Amino acid sequence: MQTRNAFSWLKKQITRSISVSLMIYILTRTSISSAYPIFAQQGYENPREATGRIVCANCHLANKPVEIEVPQAVLPDTVFEAVVRIPYDMQLKQVLANGKKGGLNVGAVLILPEGFELAPPDRISPEMKEKIGNLSFQSYRPNKTNILVVGPVPGKKYSEITFPILSPDPATKKDVHFLKYPIYVGGNRGRGQIYPDGNKSNNTVYNATAAGIVSKIIRKEKGGYEITITDASEGRQVVDIIPPGPELLVSEGESIKFDQPLTSNPNVGGFGQGDAEIVLQDPLRVQGLLFFLASVILAQIFLVLKKKQFEKVQLAEMNF
């Protein structure tokens, strides 16, 4: 009886441990996956400044390319693809928050014209769903459904991101018109160099906060360094803290200048932005164009037939 009770108690403890571990993993993954877009969402009402600069560039300092591909024109109430490409060398490894090396993640923000929005799931074709994969898109704000964010997601799998977009219908949305509209995109690969509060991440270069002699370098147990700089003229000491990740470039006894790099720059990623144009096409205009082209073709056909008939008449008169 005691053996059975002990076995039952052990089984409950194992089940509880597995459940707790699974909950921690899920919460951690959720926190990590939602952290980066939230930085911009919490700090800025609009991700695109009046100058045209997308605010993600405030934290991702390196400039890298990004590409966007959209149709030249779309009809009202139509689902189409906006493809964002974030190219980078897949062999690169970035510095993670714990100082270790890992793969790069990517993220993107898509700023659509007013009225354009994420297509509902029941309007997305199976072919488009296959291109989208397991990506989860969200609106930048509940009242800004035309601005979409995604990421961070693994770069090796999602360096090309397909957004399913639904075009508006001017017949139901009076503030939308049949015009040419701009679309703006921002895309990053890798972690940022500065947090929204202004503090540096461990994915950037660290500079000396004072000039003098490097009198002491202490390697911390969990990684990183404490560098003591002594100013010989004033006799004061300054301690610079280096987090785990960047590679140290100075040594004890070395004379350094103010703002001199103490570490290498481990950043291999960066942010880029681009734009494209799309025309919301009036179906009646398309029908009118088709009618015009058809009339031109018919006119050409009748002209050819008339010419051949005229030639036959001329030939008959000559034979007569």
UniProtKB/Swiss-Prot annotation:
GO MF, any single term: iron ion binding
GO CC list: chloroplast thylakoid membrane
Cofactor note: Binds 1 heme group covalently.
Binding-site residues for heme, renumbered to this chain: Y36, C56, C59, H60
Matches recorded under SUPFAM superfamilies: Cytochrome f subunit of the cytochrome b6f complex, transmembrane anchor (SSF103431), Cytochrome f, large domain (SSF49441), Rudiment single hybrid motif (SSF51246)
Keyword Heme: yes
Database matches in InterPro entries: Cyt-f_TM (IPR024058), Cyt_f (IPR002325), Cyt_f_lg_dom (IPR024094), Cyt_f_lg_dom_sf (IPR036826), Rudment_hybrid_motif (IPR011054)
Subunit structure: The 4 large subunits of the cytochrome b6-f complex are cytochrome b6, subunit IV (17 kDa polypeptide, petD), cytochrome f and the Rieske protein, while the 4 small subunits are PetG, PetL, PetM and PetN. The complex functions as a dimer.
Name this protein carries in UniProt: Cytochrome f
Taxonomic path: Eukaryota, Viridiplantae, Streptophyta, Embryophyta, Tracheophyta
Gene: petA
